[in-house]
Curated annotation (Swiss-Prot):
Belongs to the prostaglandin G/H synthase family. This is Prostaglandin G/H synthase 2. Dual cyclooxygenase and peroxidase in the biosynthesis pathway of prostanoids, a class of C20 oxylipins mainly derived from arachidonate ((5Z,8Z,11Z,14Z)-eicosatetraenoate, AA, C20:4(n-6)), with a particular role in the inflammatory response. The cyclooxygenase activity oxygenates AA to the hydroperoxy endoperoxide prostaglandin G2 (PGG2), and the peroxidase activity reduces PGG2 to the hydroxy endoperoxide prostaglandin H2 (PGH2), the precursor of all 2-series prostaglandins and thromboxanes. It comes from Rattus norvegicus (Rat). Keywords: Acetylation, Dioxygenase, Disulfide bond, Endoplasmic reticulum, Fatty acid biosynthesis, Fatty acid metabolism, Glycoprotein, Heme, Iron, Lipid biosynthesis, Lipid metabolism, Membrane, Metal-binding, Microsome, Nucleus, Oxidoreductase, Peroxidase, Prostaglandin biosynthesis, Prostaglandin metabolism, S-nitrosylation, Signal. Pfam families: An_peroxidase, EGF.
Length: 604
């Protein structure tokens, strides 16, 4: 009888044994498949490795590994030797060859077609075809794994509030040594909200941004109904209003477009744009206004060039031109600034025409998560000689009208943003958003930091001190997580030691760049079928794209052509400004900004 009981217990134990793939035994992007309840097999197909766990390199792979420099070495070369890079930048053949390598080496790290999502940790038609899911770079940790990170770490992750308070929250503002400014910060927020549109009703693994890329739905609206409400249906233009001799977005009343505004916001300040959340802060409405003006400006140019075209063709072609302008500005101004490279990046779709490249994209939830750059935000916003708190800034379009776009551009170009990596720089005002980012990552069962580093060809960290580059935060993290292999992705990105004089650490760049460049160059307008003058109304439209920059965008649409850049030209200690005691029309004294932002989206 006792023997039977022992056998029964053993059988029950085996039936509840952990999934053998929980330990992530397959290396170098090999795929683990369970066989029975306690065996697994690694599929090493086309990885360049073989063996039980895909750890033995093939001959050509071994040579590539010997010759390939580390990401930090590449970064060092690209951010030093300025004289050499000045020569390279002026030799088209060399510049094109290097840019082609940058694009292909980065974008080939992204699976296309997509593979996994929050509910499918294996290949399935649902994971491929259902656009309402974010895709995944790594499958979720299986439900039957013994710990949240597979087999490493404790059975429970540390309290997210404790993680936030000990290593993420700001003690004092840490400016970005790379000189990133608020013009950049609000561009990032405005630009990414066309594809980071989490469906909060369905959960963090789902998106409402079904275009999965740069389609400018934040300008034109996600649905055809919203687009039609925003359109003038005359000369291809969008609706607008004129205030003080300048063009601004129309109101909610005039368009009947749904926007998110608290009840106290006056009717005349409820501007209506493509993204319903852009009334949150005037910095977002600034860019919404600039792109509205740009669309209507391009329509005027096309109308003059093609008087025979109807409203629909003028609208659709102008949209394609603005998509092209956006991609060019993002690569040549935005990514250029973030990289810190002396090599001059170039937007030229023809560089990929003879390469293996798929013109499609699917936004990954990890890309959404890593883009939560809340440390960029300052403690206050300086416009002209006035200083606004978070409370005064929220849902207060009156500030935009009071100061005007020119002063906004000038002020945000001068105001330095915060450093993202290095820890302890998340503003208290958005702590609820940062906490939600941790909680939602857990809900989506992200794998550990080191698993993501391996996925993107980086060496895993061996200690918390190696991660942070110092001892004090490393000790806090060790007490919280115990094992470096159990370190969560999102907090790790914010506490990772920054590269020298840089805004980010290694992991943020090496994970983010492939997602970014694949999404940009995978746009249909970059394909051989689209990338030709006739797509954009002829040479005139093509020239608008090929000469676009953040400075030209501002000059063409803001009075006085104020200087615009994504970095502070001469970083100075922040001067004391006059605190603006008035919230103007906003009446926000009784509003908690962290609650408001959390209710809207963790992406804001």
């Amino acid at each position: 009888m006792l023997f039977r009981a022992v056998l029964l217990c053993a059988a029950l134990a085996l039936s509840h044994a952990a999934n053998p793939c929980c330990s992530n035994p397959c290396q170098n992007r090999g795929e683990c498949m369970s066989i029975g309840f306690d065996q697994y097999k690694c599929d090493c197909t086309r990885t360049g490795f073989y063996g039980e766990n895909c750890t033995t390199p093939e001959f050509l792979t071994r040579i590539k590994l010997l010759l390939k420099p580390t990401p930090n070495t590449v970064h060092y070369i690209l951010t030093h030797f300025k004289g050499v890079w000045n020569i390279v930048n002026n030799i088209p053949f060399l510049r094109n060859s290097i840019m082609r390598y940058v694009l292909t080496s980065r974008s080939h790290l992204i699976d296309s077609p997509p593979t996994y999502n929050v509910h499918y940790g294996y290949k399935s038609w649902e994971a491929f075809s259902n656009l309402s899911y974010y895709t995944r770079a790594l499958p979720p940790v299986a439900d039957d794994c013994p710990t949240p990170m597979g087999v490493k770490g404790n059975k429970e992750l540390p309290d997210s509030k404790e993680v936030l308070e000990k290593v993420l929250l700001r003690r004092e503002f840490i400016p970005d040594p790379q000189g990133t400014n608020m013009m950049f910060a609000f561009f990032a927020q405005h630009f990414t909200h066309q594809f980071f549109k989490t469906d909060q009703k369905r959960g963090p693994g789902f998106t409402r941004g079904l275009g999965h890329g740069v389609d400018l739905n934040h300008v034109y609206g996600e649905t055809l109904d919203r687009q039609h409400k925003l359109r003038l249906f005359q000369d291809g233009k969008l609706k607008y209003q004129v205030i003080g001799g300048e063009v601004y977005p129309p109101t909610v009343k005039d368009t009947q477009v749904d926007m998110i505004y608290p009840p106290h916001v006056p009717e005349h300040l409820r501007f209506a744009v493509g993204q319903e959340v852009f009334g949150l802060v005037p910095g977002l409405m600034m860019y919404a206004t600039i792109w509205l003006r740009e669309h209507n400006r391009v329509c005027d140019i096309l109308k003059q060039e093609h008087p025979e075209w109807d409203d629909e063709r003028l609208f659709q072609t102008s949209r394609l031109i603005l998509i092209g302008e956006t991609i060019k500005i993002v690569i040549e101004d935005y990514v250029q600034h973030l990289s810190g490279y002396h090599f001059k990046l170039k937007f030229d779709p023809e560089l990929l025409f003879n390469q293996q490249f798929q013109y499609q994209n699917r936004i990954a939830s990890e890309f959404n998560t890593l883009y939560h750059w809340h440390p960029l935000l300052p403690d206050t916003f300086n416009i002209e000689d006035q200083e606004y708190t978070f409370k005064q800034f929220l849902y207060n379009n009156s500030i935009l009208l009071e100061h005007g776009l020119a002063h906004f551009v000038e002020s945000f170009t001068r105001q330095i943003a915060g450093r993202v990596a290095g820890g302890r720089n998340v503003p208290i005002a958005v702590q609820a958003v940062a906490k939600a980012s941790i909680d939602q990552s857990r809900e989506m069962k992200y794998q550990s930091l080191n698993e993501y580093r391996k996925r993107f060809s980086l060496k895993p960290y061996t200690s918390f001190e190696e991660l942070t580059g110092e001892k004090e935060m490393a000790a806090e993290l060790k007490a919280l997580y115990h094992d470096i292999d159990a370190m969560e992705l999102y907090p790790a990105l914010l506490v990772e030691k920054p590269r020298p004089d840089a805004i980010f650490g290694e992991t943020m760049v090496e994970l983010g760049a492939p997602f970014s460049l694949k999404g940009l160059m995978g746009n249909p307008i970059c394909s051989p079928q689209y990338w030709k003058p006739s797509t954009f109304g002829g040479e005139v439209g093509f020239r608008i794209i090929n000469t676009a920059s953040i400075q030209s965008l501002i000059c063409n649409n803001v009075k006085g052509c104020p200087f615009a850049s994504f970095n502070v030209q001469d970083p100075q200690p922040t001067k004391t400004a006059t605190i603006n005691a008035s919230a103007s029309h906003s009446r926000l004294d009784d509003i908690n900004p962290t609650v408001l932002i959390k209710r809207r989206s963790t992406e804001l």
